[in-house]
Structure formats: C-alpha cells, structure tokens
C-alpha cells in the first residue's frame, strides 16, 4: 500500500478489508499470498562456479596469456627430440599463473555476494498475528505474513514487515530503527496520520519498519508491505542493482592491457612478416609451412616477453603488505585494490554518529539556581569533562573543579538523575570499555551521577565492574522506586514515585520528574534554591528558558532535560495508573531543581584530522540522519564549518535537497559539506553526483541503510561496531569506528601508490627490454637469444623480488600536503615513457649484444662473422659461406646463457635506479631500502642456482659461465646506471614540475657545492669494482672490429 502513513487507521483497515479485532480470513490470506508472495527477501541467484571462473578470463592481459599458453602447448605437442619435455614447461607455468589468478578472483567475488545474503539476518523468524481461524493471537513463521495481516508486537520483538500502527497498548511505544535510519536514539511512535506524502522514514512516526527492534511498549498494526516491498527490501534491490566501481588502478591496468595487446599484436605480426623470406630456409627442410610455424613460435615468445606476468603478483603483494600496515592502525581492508584507491580520495562522506562523534551521549553542562531576588535570579552553571561512558571526569565551575556535595541543589539533581532512570553502565571486560545498558540519554545521566559523586563515596580499590554504578547504588539505597509514569507525547516527560527505605518524620514519598524543558517548566510552581523552596516568578522562568534556548541553539546545540520534584505527591491509592491521560495531573505543582545539557560529543582527535584533510585537498562532508541544527553545530566544532561561517547552500536536509531540481542538486553536491535528515536513497544520489565530477569518494556507514551507498562509492568504509550488511558491502572496516583512522589510511594509500608507480615502471621497462631483444634477434636473423621459459623465470622470479621490495620505499614527508592525484593521471607520462623506452632499448640491445659477443669475439667461442651469424639458417656443409663452421654451434647454450645473465644483471641495476624516481644513487644509496638490497642478492642467488645446480640448466637450456664471461656480463650491464643517472639529471634540473631553471646567485659551483649530499661510502665501495671490471680484457672491442 502506497503512502500508508498519510491515511487514517480506518482508511488503511478499509483498504485491506480487515477488522482489527479478528484479522484476515484464510481465504483472504491465500489470495494475498498468491499476489504478494512470501514475506522474505529472495535469495540472490549467485553466479555458478563455472560462470565465476570464466569471468576471471575476461581480462585482456589474461586472454593474451591464455592464448600464448594454448599455442605453446600445441607447438610443444609437435616438438621432436630432446626438447619435448622442456617445451611443456612454458605453457604449464603460464596456466599455473592463470589458475592462481582465477582462484583469487573467484574467492573475492564470492565474498562480495555475501553482502546481499547478510541482509537475511534482519529477517525475523516468527511473528504474532490475529486471523479469523482463531480467537486469540497466534505465532506463525514471519515468511507467511501477508499485507493486511493484523500483527501484535511487544518489547524485544523484531518487526516482521512494514506495519502501519493501529493502536498502542502501552503508555508509549519506542522503536530502535538505527539500522535503517541511522538515528542514535530510539523513536517514540504514535497512530495519527502523517499528512506529508514525501515524509522521510525518520518522520513516519506511525510506521514500523521490517527488521527494526521494539525497545519499549506494546502495539497492534496492519501489515502494509512484505518482502521486497518493505524498506529493507528496497535497500536489497538497490544493492543488487549497484555495479561495483573499478578502482583507478584497475582502470589504469585495463588501459595498459589494451595498449599492450595492440603493441604486442603489431610487433608479433611485424616479426612474422619480416621473416617471410626465411620460411623456405634449408633449416626448415625447405618446407614453407614449417618455416611459418617456426617464426610463429618466435612471435609467441615475443608475446610472453611483452606481458609482465609478475605484475599481478607484485601488485597483490605490495597491497597485502599495505593492508598489514593499515590493520595496525585499526583499518581492516577487505578489498586489496581499494588500498590504492584510498590514495586518490578527494571526498570523504562521513556519518556523524559514532564516526565523527563518540556515539556515547554525555552531559557536558548543567545549572541549578544560586540566588533569587524578587523577579530576578542568578544561576550556578557547571561544565563536566569526559566524553565517553567511562565514569571518569570532573565537574567544573569557572574552569575550576568543585566538590558536588557542597551544593544542596546538585545533591538533589543527582538523586533525580539516578532514580528517574532505567539505564545503567556496564564494564565490558572483553573490549575493555564501559558500555550503556538501556537508553543513551538515561545512560548519560547515570554517568553524570558517577562523575558528581555527591555523597563522596570511597571509590579507590573498586574493580572496574564495581565502579560502573557505585555512586548510583548509594543513591538507590536511600529510596525505593515504587512505580514509573512512562513518557508520553502530550506531556513530554516521565516520572518515578519513590518512598524512603528508612521512613521518618522528615522523609516522605517524592515524585521525581525529567523531561523536555518547555513541558516540565510550564508545570513548575516553585524553584529550588539550595535546600529552600521559592515560588517561580515570570522573570525567573524567562531567565531559565533563555539559558536553555541558548544551550539548545548555540555552538553546541545541546539536548536539554529539565529536572524537577513533587515534594507532596498524591498517595498511590488515589492515582489511576491504567490511563496515561491522567499522568499530567499528577505531575503538576512541581519544583524546578535544575537542567542538564547533553550531546553526542565529537571525538577528541577528529578536529585535527579534518584540518589534515583540508591540507591534503580532501573535502569532508557530514551525512547524518540527525536534525540539521545538531549536525551543523558538530560541523562547527570539528572544523568542517568555521565558527561564524554562513552555511547557506552548504548544509541541506534530505527534504531541502529533494526540492531542488537536478542541476541544482548537482551544484549542491559540489559545494555542500553537511547533509542532515537523509535517507538511504539520498546517500546513493550524493555519491552519483560526486562521481559525475570525477571525485573519488570514500563513504562511511554502519547501518543496513548505508549498504547501497557503501557499495556504490569507490571506497565503502564500514564501522567495526556496524551491521554485517554494511561490513560485507564495504572495502574497509574501521576496527575503532574512528574518523582519524580513515585519514591515516588515506596517507598509507598515497604512500603505497607512489611505491607501486616505481615498481610498475621498473617491470614495464624490463619487458620493453625483452621485446626489443626478441625483435632485434628476429630482425637481424640471429639465433634465439631468449626462450619463453627463461622469460617467464625473469618476469616472475628474478624481476618479481626487487619489484616487491620497491614497495618498502619510505613515504615522502610532505605526502599529506599535496592535493589528491588525478585518478586519470597516466601511470607513465610522456617523458617517463621516453625514459623507459630508452632504458628498455638499451636492455634489449645489451642482451642481444651479449649473445653476439660469444659468437663473434669470445675466447672459446666459434668466432664467426656477423654475416654468418645473421644468416645462420643457411648453414650447411655444402654452403661456401659457412666453410669451416660447425652448424651445431648455433644451437650452443652459451650465447643464451650470456643473454639471460645480462638481462638479469641489468634488471638488478635497473632496480637500483628505481629506488627514487628522480634522485641520484650518489645521494640516495641502495641501503636506504635494505629490503631492495636483500631482494637483489636473493634474485642473483636464484640465477646462480639455475646456472650451476643440476638439472636446472637443462630445463632452462643454459650452461655455467666462467669468470671472463661474468666480467663481460658486468661490462655490458653497468652502463644502464650511468644512462639512467643522466636521464634523472635532466628530469631533476629541467623537467621536474614547478622547478624554475634559475642559476643560483649566492652559491658558486665550487667543488664542495657540487658534492654536497653525496654518499661517499657508496662511491668508495663502487669505484674499485668499476675500475676492475673495465680494466680486464674480455675481447669486447673485437666484436666491433671483426
């Protein structure tokens, strides 16, 4: 039924044709069940395991690898001779990588689907209904409830469907609907129509929503929506419809994959076309098809070389290390890619209750009467320290601590707070914190009594459990609570009737009252000044109300409660306690004692975190279900708004936002920093508008209502104390529910991205080198310098270790003084592309050069000519060009070993280059990142392992090298450091952003100035090695003069 909240009880009952006392007939139930179905959220039809596995292979990079593996497998099948077994290694390793990748992907997908299933925990199992087949209430399965059913609910029940209240059977009905609306306190319900058809859920005071809990009272109602038509069902539909946004890094890698696939395709085709003339060479037995297949194999090797197979593993490792560091800071990351996304967060949309505030109501101000002279009076105003439920804090007057037992008015005020109260404090030993038992407002009063300690109770030596209610217990021993007059909407107060535990002539029964100031003070005829009772005058009343109004609308926007007593109440026998309409008569002729002002206080550390966000160019937006006045006041206290800042067009309620046209809504999201009284749909809409401005949005939430927006935003952040739905829909969970933890996580995310950039560039330059190597080999007609299994080893193992170690580079000191990076900023800029292309070309040329050196100039090598090397496929006994050359020499493992050793060594040098993007190695020596030094040593050890430990040389088709050959490897590899140092110098002095090329006027370029900051231990360590390497003769020059 649409807009049931706007209809009268009679209209709603008439719509369903039902009588409140008898309920639906079985025939009606059957028809309604057929029309509306079961009252449950349908199980999400998850993807099958096969569908999930297939989905993992939709990534372009993965498809290229899969194609390469399949082709390699087919080619290996037709391989002949000794190479048959080794030929299968390559496709097997590639498939192993892909399977591991798919397993991780499927596992993450399965986790994501749990979010929707977690909603089921809010579905009640049973419900109490009236139906015509029985005269009394009956318990049935909640899923069998239909629209039109008459339902009974009472304290402790979970609401089984969306219900329009028809009658309340207790004094009041309180409902905890925080999981749905985010309201921090339970809500009082009534049965009157709410005429506004556009009312938000918080304002539908005559409705109960499925999955919420009854905090107090008993009522009857008619079901108006079941299953997916309930408010919680709509959230489920929204979650199902919400597509998970890909993180900026995932998008970058997708783009990189596309570009790479195009480049690979072009190069593979080019290599194959270049060699068409060689298809009929004698080595292929004169068969054009065999020649075509041979060069197709080379093209496949090229594809393997071009794909950075180690990249996914290195990224995962770096992100995983980042998550461990974040977990130590109480940020538990559920989705690895979101670690990097945190680094470019530009907007944080934060919940108020529990995140920016403690979600622990505390009394921070109170007053009692000091003096009354005629129509004027003065007040004793006090402030209270401590902003949690811990009974630790002091009462201050004029910024000095006071002893509360010295003020009679405070003793009576504490007595009212302790007795007119059904809540308590409890120490949770597992968590090590004090928690509320009962209502937040009443717990704040319980905590106040503990801080006041009006009877000077000895508290030393008490355990934390005993300490929780020590002072309250002393007061409760003095008087016995006989009965309670529950809160009602008409009088806006509640009271307790108490009798002394030790009756005497002076001590009599009393009624203690607390409630909304305007309701209580209107019924006060007297005021308490010290221990005397003085008549209330209009002037005194005006003074009291002006202070209360100031507290309620000032910078704190306190929630005020007036406290009063009835010194001579009627006897219990004279009262009619069955009818709550009479309660207001018994709560008249009251004596005003004092007033307390409370709030859900901001966390102490939040203000500094908001300031840090502003420095880092991150906008903080508060989004709350609370009212606008309170929200703006908290914003001012924590620095989202300035103390006197005009909040027009910067703060909106959900209703005000809805009344704007779409373009005005979009404009509002661009400028606003506070949204109050919002519904779940508003949060999702705000995220959409922010995303339309290319903002990277982090959204916090803890309730079921937050789940769709958490899923839609780039970074969904759930509270550790939040619902399972919110946690499973999020990328990150805050173990301590603290806003400051988000800021720490953003800082960590920025550091991780900077390091990730370094190792991605390092790996890509390595792959460029491998591509250039194979392309040059094919273009020059040389024998294979590197084979696919060797390339896989380099990409996955020897390159992977230093790349992972680059993730340990220390973060920049000014990392939170820079604006968020643009998520569209390319991983590799034009200059960097040139730089790594240049390095890559050198790597490729050096690798091919090392193999050529062995053929042309090495001692113990065949010493063939360049022509013979580039036409080796024409080598046969009757060819005069190859007279005296053993054709088997072109299949020797030595040149391949030289090429692989140069590739590995040059990549280790390249890892040192990646220690800093633009800083020289002379100023930033390798031991700045000790993990990098360790990983380089480990990589080289693994390379020695495959060279010198049988049977690994056979698998990799290589052979051990002697000292002269290793010196040659070093000669060819070390120049890459000099080359990159030159490029860094250009970047530092001419291309660095914001760098002005101005000649310093004050500092002459003396020797000391030029050598300032150089690490001399590094220079002294490296110079002897370089001199020794280049002074040893290895016939290097012979290669060029042969």
UniProtKB/Swiss-Prot annotation:
Annotated positions of the Phosphothreonine modification: 441
Catalyzed reactions per annotation: Ca(2+)(in) + ATP + H2O = Ca(2+)(out) + ADP + phosphate + H(+)
Residues at which Ca(2+) 1 binds: 304-305, 307, 309, 795, 799
Gene3D superfamilies (alphabetical): Calcium-transporting ATPase, cytoplasmic domain N, Calcium-transporting ATPase, cytoplasmic transduction domain A, Calcium-transporting ATPase, transmembrane domain, HAD superfamily/HAD-like
Modified residues annotated as Phosphoserine in this record: 38, 531, 580, 663
Cofactor: Mg(2+)
Annotated stretches, region: Interaction with TMEM64 and PDIA3: 788-1042
Disulfide cysteine pairs (residue numbers): 875-887
Protein source organism: Sus scrofa (Pig)
EC numbers: 7.2.2.10
Cytoplasmic-side segments: 1-48, 111-253, 314-756, 808-827, 917-929, 985-1042
Superkingdom as given in the UniProt entry: Eukaryota
NCBIfam families: ATPase-IIA1_Ca, ATPase_P-type
Region span, Interaction with PLN: 787-807, 931-942
Protein name per the record: Sarcoplasmic/endoplasmic reticulum calcium ATPase 2
Cited PROSITE patterns: ATPASE_E1_E2 (PS00154)
GO MF annotations in UniProt: ATP binding; ATP hydrolysis activity; calcium channel regulator activity; calcium ion binding; enzyme binding; lncRNA binding; P-type calcium transporter activity involved in regulation of cardiac muscle cell membrane potential; S100 protein binding
């Amino acid at each position: 039924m649409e807009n049931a909240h706007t209809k009268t009880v009679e209209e709603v009952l008439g719509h369903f044709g039902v009588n409140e006392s008898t309920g639906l007939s079985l025939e009606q139930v059957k028809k309604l069940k057929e029309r509306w179905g079961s009252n449950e959220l349908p199980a999400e039809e998850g993807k099958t395991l096969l569908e999930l596995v297939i989905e993992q292979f939709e990534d372009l990079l993965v498809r290229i690898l899969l194609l390469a593996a399949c082709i390699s497998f087919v080619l290996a099948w037709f391989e002949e001779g000794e190479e048959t077994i080794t030929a299968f290694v390559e496709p097997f390793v590639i498939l192993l990588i892909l399977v591991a990748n798919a397993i991780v992907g499927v596992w993450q997908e399965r986790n994501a689907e749990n979010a929707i299933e977690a909603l089921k925990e809010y579905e009640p199992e049973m419900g109490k209904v009236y139906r015509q087949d029985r005269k009394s209430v009956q318990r049935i399965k909640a899923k069998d409830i239909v629209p039109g059913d008459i339902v009974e609910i009472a304290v402790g029940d979970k609401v089984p469907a969306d219900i329009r209240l028809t009658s309340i059977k207790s004094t009041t009905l309180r409902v905890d609907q925080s999981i749905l609306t985010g309201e921090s306190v339970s809500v009082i319900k009534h049965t009157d129509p709410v005429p506004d058809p556009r009312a938000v859920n918080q304002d539908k005071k005559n409705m109960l929503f499925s999955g919420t809990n009854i905090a107090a009272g008993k009522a009857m109602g008619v079901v108006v929506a079941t299953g997916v038509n309930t408010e919680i069902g709509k959230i489920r539909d929204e979650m199902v419809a919400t597509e998970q946004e890909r993180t900026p890094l995932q998008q970058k890698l997708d783009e990189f994959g596309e570009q790479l696939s195009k480049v690979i395709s072009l190069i593979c085709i080019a290599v194959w076309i270049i060699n068409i003339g060689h298809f009929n060479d004698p080595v292929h037995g004169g068969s054009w098809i065999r020649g075509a297949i041979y060069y197709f194999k080379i093209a496949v090797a090229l594809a393997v070389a071009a794909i950075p197979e180690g990249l996914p593993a290195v990224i995962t490792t770096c992100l995983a290390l980042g998550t461990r560091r974040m977990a130590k800071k109480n940020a538990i990351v559920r989705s690895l890619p979101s670690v990097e996304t945190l680094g470019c967060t530009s907007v944080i949309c934060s919940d108020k209750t529990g995140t920016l505030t403690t979600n622990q109501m505390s009394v921070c101000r109170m007053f009692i009467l000091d003096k009354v002279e005629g129509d004027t009076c003065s007040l004793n105003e006090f402030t209270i320290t401590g902003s949690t439920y811990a009974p630790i804090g002091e009462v201050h007057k004029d910024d000095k601590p006071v002893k509360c037992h010295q003020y009679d008015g405070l003793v009576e005020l504490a007595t009212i707070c302790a007795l007119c109260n059904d809540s308590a404090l409890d120490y949770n030993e597992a968590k090590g914190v004090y928690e509320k038992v009962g209502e937040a407002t009443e717990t704040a009063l319980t905590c106040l009594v503990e801080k006041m300690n009006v009877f000077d109770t000895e508290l030393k030596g008490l355990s934390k459990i005993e300490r929780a209610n020590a002072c309250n217990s002393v007061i409760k021993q003095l008087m016995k609570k006989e009965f309670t007059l529950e809160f009602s909407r008409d009088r806006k107060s509640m009271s307790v009737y108490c009798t002394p535990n030790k009756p005497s002539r002076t001590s009599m029964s009393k009624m203690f009252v607390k409630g909304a100031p305007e309701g209580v003070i209107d019924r006060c005829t007297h005021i308490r000044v010290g221990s005397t009772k003085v008549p209330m005058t209009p002037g005194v009343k005006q003074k009291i109300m002006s202070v209360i109004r100031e507290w309620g609308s000032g910078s704190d926007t306190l929630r005020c409660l007036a406290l009063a007593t009835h010194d001579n109440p009627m006897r219990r026998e004279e009262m009619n306690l069955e009818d709550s309409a009479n309660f207001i008569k018994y709560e008249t002729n009251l004596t005003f004692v004092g007033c307390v002002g409370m709030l859900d206080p901001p966390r102490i550390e939040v203000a500094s975190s908001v300031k840090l966000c502003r420095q880092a160019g991150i906008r903080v937006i508060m989004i709350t279900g609370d009212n606008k006045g309170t929200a703006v006041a908290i914003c001012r206290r924590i620095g989202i708004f300035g103390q006197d800042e005009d909040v027009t067009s910067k703060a909106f309620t959900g209703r005000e936002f809805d009344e704007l046209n779409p373009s005005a809504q979009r404009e509002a999201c661009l400028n606003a920093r506070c949204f109050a009284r919002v519904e779940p749909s508003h949060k999702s809409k705000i995220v959409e508008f922010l995303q339309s401005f290319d903002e990277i949005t982090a959204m916090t939430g803890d309730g079921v209502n937050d789940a769709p927006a958490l899923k839609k935003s780039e970074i969904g952040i759930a509270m550790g104390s939040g619902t399972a739905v919110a946690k499973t829909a999020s990328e990150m969970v805050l173990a301590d529910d603290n806003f400051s933890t988000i800021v720490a996580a953003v800082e960590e995310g920025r550091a991780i991205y900077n390091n990730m950039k370094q190792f991605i560039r390092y790996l890509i330059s390595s792959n460029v080198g491998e591509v250039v190597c194979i392309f040059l080999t094919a273009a020059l007609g040389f024998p294979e310098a590197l084979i696919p299994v060797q390339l896989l080893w380099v990409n996955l193992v020897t390159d992977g270790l230093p790349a992972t170690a680059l993730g340990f580079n220390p973060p920049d000191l000014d990392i939170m003084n820079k604006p968020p990076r643009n998520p569209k900023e390319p991983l590799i800029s034009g200059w960097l592309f040139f730089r790594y292309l240049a390095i890559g070309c050198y790597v490729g040329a050096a690798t091919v050069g090392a193999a050529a050196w062995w053929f042309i100039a090495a001692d113990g090598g065949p010493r063939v000519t360049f022509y013979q090397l580039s036409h080796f496929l024409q080598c046969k006994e009757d060819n005069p060009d190859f007279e005296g050359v053993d054709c088997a020499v072109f299949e020797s493992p030595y040149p391949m070993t030289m090429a692989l050793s140069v590739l590995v060594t040059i990549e280790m040098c390249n890892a040192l280059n990646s220690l800093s993007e633009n800083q020289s190695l002379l100023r930033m020596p390798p031991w700045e990142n000790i993990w990098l030094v360790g990983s380089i040593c480990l990589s080289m050890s693994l390379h020695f392992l495959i060279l010198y430990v049988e049977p690994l040389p056979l698998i990799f088709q290589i052979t051990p090298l002697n000292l002269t050959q290793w010196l040659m490897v070093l000669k060819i590899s070390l120049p890459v450091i000099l080359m990159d140092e030159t490029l860094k110098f250009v970047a530092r002095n001419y291309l660095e952003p914001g760098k002005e090329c101005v000649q310093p006027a004050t500092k002459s370029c003396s020797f000391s100035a030029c050598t300032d900051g150089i690490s001399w231990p590094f220079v002294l360590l490296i110079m002897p090695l370089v001199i020794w390497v280049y002074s040893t003769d290895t016939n290097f020059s012979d290669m060029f003069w042969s």
